[in-house]
């Protein structure tokens, strides 16, 4: 017997439903005499960031010459819960080797400075609006 968890994230709830159906279909199979039981432990709604705030961050990064891209985050950051109550967005800073939320995570001072600069200028844009 062994136990493991599977975390599925996507911005489209219909895609998540399909993923869950695929995972649940494992219960119908047997591998070398082993079976599988799937239990959905918890669920949360997809959170969408405030489009105006995202536009401020994007414009700020572009004006400062900071390389950027839009990504959807399914992570359970505090901002996810704040987004239900007030306009919210997030800025992610590049991590070495893409490692995040673990001991070897490292973001260079240059990348942190770029993230802070993008955030400061986005806040100033929001304040001027």
Language model: regions and residue ranges:
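A common structural junction motif
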Residues: 24-32
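Midchain, well-structured core segments that form catalytic/ion-binding scaffolds
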Residues: 1-18, 42
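Short gly/pro-enriched beta-turn/loop segments at secondary-structure junctions
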Residues: 1-2, 31-34
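Hydrophobic alpha-helix feature that most strongly marks membrane-spanning transmembrane helices
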Residues: 7, 28, 62, 84, ...
């Amino acid at each position: 017997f062994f136990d493991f968890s599977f975390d599925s994230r996507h911005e489209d709830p219909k895609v998540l439903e399909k993923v869950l159906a695929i995972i649940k279909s494992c219960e119908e199979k047997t591998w070398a005499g082993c079976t599988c039981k799937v239990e959905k432990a918890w669920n949360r709604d997809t959170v969408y960031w405030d489009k105006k705030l995202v536009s401020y961050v994007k414009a700020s990064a572009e004006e400062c010459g900071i390389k950027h891209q839009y990504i959807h985050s399914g992570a359970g950051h505090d901002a996810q819960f704040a987004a239900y109550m007030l306009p919210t967005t997030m800025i992610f800073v590049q991590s070495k080797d893409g490692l995040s939320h673990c001991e070897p995570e490292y973001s260079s001072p240059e990348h942190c400075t770029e993230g802070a600069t993008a955030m400061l200028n986005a806040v100033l844009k929001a304040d001027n609006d």
